[in-house]
Amino acid sequence: MAPGPARISLGSQLLPMVPLLLLLRGAGCGHRGPSWSSLPSAAAGLQGDRDSQQSPGDAAAALGPGAQDMVAIHMLRLYEKYNRRGAPPGGGNTVRSFRARLEMIDQKPVYFFNLTSMQDSEMILTAAFHFYSEPPRWPRAREVFCKPRAKNASCRLLTPGLPARLHLIFRSLSQNTATQGLLRGAMALTPPPRGLWQAKDISSIIKAARRDGELLLSAQLDTGEKDPGVPRPSSHMPYILVYANDLAISEPNSVAVSLQRYDPFPAGDFEPGAAPNSSADPRVRRAAQVSKPLQDNELPGLDERPAPALHAQNFHKHEFWSSPFRALKPRTGRKDRKKKDQDTFTAASSQVLDFDEKTMQKARRRQWDEPRVCSRRYLKVDFADIGWNEWIISPKSFDAYYCAGACEFPMPKIVRPSNHATIQSIVRAVGIVPGIPEPCCVPDKMNSLGVLFLDENRNAVLKVYPNMSVETCACR
């Protein structure tokens, strides 16, 4: 009879472990990875960029203190992915993120989103709601005591039931009131066995809200239970990503429209149409009057090169197109010769910028090393120099380049002149029509630049601006 009590004692020791065994069995059978829905851009933004050299925590710190959350990490990874692969984010040129503001209504957390910063020119492609799903709260096992006359004196446990389903509810709000309004959408979710981030496609909800002009939305993760009052970590706050295609991004001056926060020239500092070296005070005279327009973007006095070498002499005969006509030798009359002499005297007597000679020689020597013919020159733009670094997260600077140089006749093949530029250079060389300028050295092929910045509501925005960096130059 001695072994009987021992077996009962062993069973009573194992009984408290039954709920844990059941929970482990359910977790082992139902374990799944993070469900990032079917949005390829969102999934690749967080899971496909593990080869980044910069850790997510360090990258998120670029958004400022307290911003090391998932939305910051997600946007930075989307930016890094575009820089590496060059693929448009989500098939468009714009990604907007919207942070949530938490409010407690009827002892339940409700998240509010302000989507009013979306521009009218931005055509919504897809939208995703990203949220952290808490691990399920399994009901406790209830003990069922045996009756006093039962032969089996051991106690039994009632198997715990399944956790409650999670309901995701979206409502639109009126801008004049803070109450929840029209129901925009609802979906039932099964809580995962462990806490993880999930994403749900809410494109139809966002498009309908924008069509109705109601861009103040609320989202509620309802479990049917009251909130226990445990504060939610700031890193687990939900957010919305909207992938759009900005139809106005190719318009002139689009980069300044979206990135410039204030006028770089305050009132009184600059007048449109005024000469660059003019002064508001008529008594002040500047020693900076250039006699002729710098059509080739070169420094004044660059022609004073020690070794006289025209740009055409630097090219072989085969580098030019064959000429179907004879050499051009325009005949000048007395009036033209007299006018030319006057222009020469005026140019010689005019003054240039009043820099010291050492600085001018250094600048000229730098340009002497560069080809005189139209070509691409190096230019690095630092956003801090133009006052945009306060809201631009990345890049801090970029290689913009620029085009400079002469497009004189005959133009070599390397400058890739257009047909119009070729005809214009011939007419100028003949000299029959006075006042015809040289063709201009302008960008031919340009590259896009992805910029990650903060909008007026401190939400991270990724935009891909076209024609930001010069790749090749040509005469036009």
UniProtKB/Swiss-Prot annotation:
GO BP annotations listed: cerebellum development; fat cell differentiation; negative regulation of ossification; osteoblast differentiation; ovulation cycle; positive regulation of osteoblast differentiation; response to kainic acid; response to transforming growth factor beta
Cysteine pairs bridged by disulfides in the record: 374-441, 403-473, 407-475
Annotated signal peptide: 1-29
Tissue: Highly expressed in epididymal adipose tissue, brain, bone and aorta and to a lesser extent in liver and spleen. Expressed at higher levels in preadipocytes than in mature adipocytes. Strongly expressed in glial cells of the cerebellum.
Primary location recorded for the protein, binned into one broad class: secreted
Propeptide: 30-366
Entry superkingdom: Eukaryota
Tagged with keyword tRNA-binding: no
GO molecular function, one term: growth factor activity
Disruption of the gene: reported phenotype: No visible phenotype.
InterPro entries xrefs: BMP3/BMP3B (IPR017197), Cystine-knot_cytokine (IPR029034), TGF-b_C (IPR001839), TGF-beta-rel (IPR015615), TGFb_CS (IPR017948)
GO cellular component, one term: extracellular space
Pfam families on file: TGF_beta (PF00019)
Glycosylation sites: 114, 152, 277, 467
Keyword line: Cleavage on pair of basic residues, Cytokine, Disulfide bond, Glycoprotein, Growth factor, Osteogenesis, Secreted, Signal
Location of region: Disordered: 39-63, 268-301
Localization in the cell: Secreted
Complex formation: Homodimer or heterodimer. Can form a non-covalent complex of the mature region and the pro-region.
Function in brief: Growth factor involved in osteogenesis and adipogenesis. Plays an inhibitory role in the process of osteoblast differentiation via SMAD2/3 pathway. Plays an inhibitory role in the process of adipogenesis.
Further details from the record: 3T3-L1 cells endogenously secrete biologically active Gdf10 as a unique complex that contains both the pro-region and the mature region.
Family affiliation: Belongs to the TGF-beta family.
Protein name: Growth/differentiation factor 10
Encoding gene, per UniProt annotation: Gdf10
